[in-house]
Amino acid sequence: MEYILGAYSQLPFGSSREEYETLLSRQLKPLLTMVYRNSSLKLLFRLGISEFEYLEQNHPEVNMLINDLCRKGQLEILSSSYYDVVLSLIPTHERTAQIEKTTTYIRKNFSRKPRGLWFYNQVFNPTTVPAVSLSGLDYIVVSTYNQVSGMTEATRPFYTEEMGKQALVFPLDDRYSKETADLYNSSTTLEKYLSNIRKMASENTSSISTIMLNLDQLMGTEGSSDVFKVIFDVMGNRCTLPGIYLSENEIARTHYLPGGIYGRDFRIGKLTSINQLIYENPKFSRNYGLVNMLRETVRDSKRLIEDRKNMDQILMKASSSSLYFPDECGNPAIHRSVNRYSCEMEVLLSRISNMVIPEETDIDFDRIPESLIAGKSNITYLSHRGAVLSRYIIPSALTDLAFHSGDGLFADSFINDKTSKEMKLAAKPYEVTSL
């Protein structure tokens, strides 16, 4: 039986130096060194752009090793969105541009053009299928295990279709993902984990198995990188890569893969979509609405923006979806990173002549617009609910003082004498007039 073995990391944009170094020392170096020393081994690989950039700046020798393995045909790198954006959260015309930008970065730095696509945190939406072929890619790699239903959609490669466009999907073998998640959640020991992996790897199946292991979940346990050696030792030299497999096999099976958050990268509870996760959290929805407003402002003000390339780069960083996921949303470093680039966008746009940012905009989807007041020393979004400051930006520090509060600044509350219940001023809309 042939198998595809892969490794992926999704350390969010804005992660700390310590996290990058732990990933490198405990996972990347042992894994890449093992593949380099055995020319018969092949590995499917995914890192985020921010991770590649960190390696380029701090450990260029690692990127050189990755480049060498790509040229030898031992490593196939997956493309993805730029700076960890969930593709379904951005406009349709920007999805292809995001993928192509990542693909170009990988091609220029690692000598090979990616052929496959990875979805950040395995958030899949059928509407992104057309972007695969438009980006010149051949296949998608994603789990089809749905945490809500507890069911796995498919175990063999298949074609999925949307709007007349097809994309080939290599579904992950969820057994390995489950064992890795259990180790991460301390539901099993390293010894038992490696034993279970060895047992599964010894089983023969008639169809190809696609195994992708989450390095972020493994890096917390020292010695867990041995799992790759276990799989290679048991399953031998039958490992292949999707590109090679497609050149030797014809896929005829079709299956419609519905939208959802797949795999076991994080616990989603009863959530059925990324949109639900965002709209149920005031801070997330405000950030999402803000980024959408900034994107539309940039689009409508092309002729007024002198350095459009720099503006687009900042907007991509501000659009990072890493903030929205439970495992990362409590990380202050992620908050600061996402917040900084949003603030930088607002400062740059506010300094353009004729003030291109709309004076009223609904950034939190409550159907009541906020009023924007921009000055030299601060930029303020004044909510009509209780005159709360939804955002209070200090341009010199590129920070929003209200960002860490779900209610905004000055969301005062008091005890109602008649009902003895707490009431918030933010619950009542107020009319805002100019002085």
Report the location of each language-model feature:
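Active-site and substrate-binding clefts of carbohydrate-active enzymes
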Residues: M1-P30, Y36-N38, R156-F158, E162-A167, ...
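Short, well-structured secondary-structure segments
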Residues: E2-P91, R115-F119, D138-T144, L241
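Generic structural signal for well-ordered alpha-helices
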Residues: L28-L32, N63-N67, T96-I106, V129, ...
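Short, charged, surface-exposed secondary-structure boundary motifs
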Residues: S88-I90, V148-R156, E179-T180, N249-A252
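CE4/NodB-like, metal-dependent polysaccharide N-deacetylase domain
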Residues: E94-N121, S195-M212
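Gly/Pro-rich turn-and-neighbor structural signature
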Residues: K108, K113, Q122-Y159
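Short His-Asn-centered micro-motif
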Residues: W118-Q122, V142-S143, F170-L172, L213-N214
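Beta-strand-rich N-terminal accessory domains
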Residues: M355-S434
